[in-house]
């Protein structure tokens, strides 16, 4: 990743992944930016279903992992999603049976937050 033209170290990074990937996604990344080591930690993700008709999101709150699917009648569901990002697991939500999700086959945007204090 290139950070040469930035004026300020970013607080958030995002990583877009197109479906059908073979390489692993890291839960943490460390970069040297402006001479300083900066660590980013995976916080959330948005995933598009295999048939590309629906999105769902995955968040971390108080160190717990959750899923949210707008078409479901539930709000935040406890869901251990970080363990699935490099697996071939597929899943469906209760109210959207036709939508199948998979971190390796679907389009995903991952969001990372900066773990160091600001300058």
Predicted regions, residues:
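Core regions of eukaryotic protease modules
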Residues: 1-37
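Conserved catalytic-core surface of thiol
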Residues: 41-119
